[in-house]
Amino acid sequence: MIAPLLCILSYNFNTFAILNVYSKLTMFCTTNSLPMDLLLKQGSLKQEVESFCYQIVSESNDQKVGILQSEDKQLQPSVSKKSEGELSRVKFISNSNKITFSKKPKRRKYDESYLSFGFTYFGNRDAPHAQCVLCKKILSNSSLAPSKLRRHLETKHAAYKDKDISFFKQHLDSPENNKPPTPKIVNTDNESATEASYNVSYHIALSGEAHTIGELLIKPCAKDVVMRMFDEQYSKKIDAVQLSNSTVARRIKDLAADIEEELVCRLKICDGFSLQLDESADVSGLAVLLVFVRYRFNKSIEEDLLLCESLQSNATGEEIFNCINSFMQKHEIEWEKCVDVCSDASRAVDGKIAEAVTLIKYVAPESTSSHCLLYRHALAVKIMPTSLKNVLDQAVQIINYIKARPHQSRLLKILCEEMGAQHTALLLNTEVRWLSRGKVLVRLFELRRELLVFMDSAFRLSDCLTNSSWLLRLAYLADIFTKLNEVNLSMQGKNVTVFTVFDKMSSLLRKLEFWASSVEEENFDCFPTLSDFLTEINSTVDKDICSAIVQHLRGLRATLLKYFPVTNDNNAWVRNPFTVTVKPASLVARDYESLIDLTSDSQVKQNFSELSLNDFWSSLIQEYPSIARRAVRVLLPFATMHLCETGFSYYAATKTKYRKRLDAAPHMRIRLSNITPNIKRICDKKTQKHCSH
């Protein structure tokens, strides 16, 4: 009986374990005066001997041996957790006194010849995994067989099945293949799905699209992309992202609330802020109030949407003020920090906006009010001599005659295409100041030949297109309005200061004087359209036309001076502190001393040439707090109503006649704000995160 036992042990264990088992088992039999054969037979001591043997073997390299099975009951030896993984090697057979051992799982070795099938090894050299050098797919150790590797090559990479080993070796040695493989890990838990839902909703709000686009377009497209580039199983994970209509609406409200919370925190800690407000009506007839705020944050001056509210009752000045005041009190924002209110209502206008501004100045006594400088510019350019005004009105009538009749517009397009014209349609004229009237008149002048052929002789203004004097005046108007619109556009945009606008106006005033002097000398090089037309017809400008042009230019300059008067600017030190040699009247002695220290700093001087005016003074708050805060207070007021005008354009594009019931305020908060929502923070506040079903 001992010989078979030793034979079994020698098959499964090392020599040290065999000797250890045999010696201790012999000692056990001698101590108890029992023959060993008796222990190995069925009997009362059998279980004790088996436990003893298991203990001995467990102490020897954590190996296990099973001894004898009872005909009546199968034994379950107790072993340590460390060795449970190898217990499968021992098989107990009932109705037999024999013991059997299953073989160890076979560990295949990697052979260099496997590279001919496009496979290298990955992981432990003693128990490697097979890795395809083409697709980087990792196979188990059991796949390290030529037949399985060849099958992968022929099914997955049939185009390379006839390549020799040198091809795969070159592919293996490339830099891309030397990078460690990155496992494909797709996190499909509810938290990740929720964050993805917020990200998609954020982009939907930024684009102004309908909420249904998430479920109807974005999710199917995302699934198609993932399925084509990765695998179908990963594509199915996208179904967990919640993008239904109602879910996207809730997500957008959460994002807007987070942005509002961040904005309120910034306003509470800032030194001061200015407001810009305007009111308009939406597609459903509601009065919509937009209020923007300008404030210093960190080392820059920021502009954000303060509120977008629908006025349910009468849109009076008191109602507008109550709406703003309610927001300020709700969030505990101090009115004392308000330094200026910009609107489209001048002091001479007695309207609801003007009334609201007056009420704001009552609760914020130190604040000032300003009139949009673009409005001043628009009012100034409307004044012109009668002869030029008549030409402008007639040009608008010709354009409207074509644009108001779709059939006429189609016929004109066909005619322009046949005549090889650069353009095929006229531009519709509008009185809105930020659209270019210059482009409208230039287009009309460029299509004058096509219009002459197209116009019916019965139309009373058709003779204007053959009148050279009329065309000369039209050419001049096209040029001057193009120049004025360029100035108008240069004053629009974010972070435009009062200094920027007055610099543009100063430049325009000097140009107007120069243009008037040039026309008096019959030099029309400043007006390219007029100059080219004179060359084309080989003619000169009549005295009365020259007189009208000079009168218009000089009158325009005088009107601009009325709306933009040249005054002694006590805040010139803000524009360029390094040119100040005398104490400005607006500064006290201590502030002027701080200004001297500032201008004597070489590093500050270098920063002045590299940074914008807003960023320059904002960056000096820590080092020169007193003088820097005074400068920032001068820079805070809005110069134009550009943000409100842009905001209403976005509002009209978001809340269309097909979405009249939409609450557009959260969309405007996201679309018109420079603050990016903290999606991680929003998700952390959610106690439950559900995936899509």
Swiss-Prot record:
Alphabetized PROSITE patterns for the sequence: ZF_BED
Molecular function as annotated in GO: DNA binding; zinc ion binding
Positions of disulphide bridges: none
Zinc finger residue extent: BED-type: 108-164
Alphabetical list of SUPFAM superfamilies matching this protein: Ribonuclease H-like
Protein name per the record: Zinc finger BED domain-containing protein 5
Keywords: Metal-binding, Zinc, Zinc-finger
Note: May be derived from an ancient transposon that has lost its ability to translocate.
Domain of life from the UniProt record: Eukaryota
Residues where Zn(2+) binds: 132, 135, 152, 157
Gene coding for it: ZBED5
InterPro entries noted in UniProt: RNaseH-like_sf, Znf_BED
Keyword Electron transport: no
